[in-house]
């Protein structure tokens, strides 16, 4: 059975505002997913690309769906 991920490549996401990162509150796009080798979903990494081209890696719990009213 194929694993289901919360987000997929191309999805718009927002970094949670309560995360201790300089990217908190910013929106980006999922560029890729790096599944955990032992299929531990909470440890999957999501590669997010920001509008200025920078890529950063986040865990699923650090992300929420982006606001779609201004997309």
Predicted regions span which residues?
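Basic/aromatic-rich interaction segments and small domains that mediate binding to polyanionic partners
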Residues: 2-70
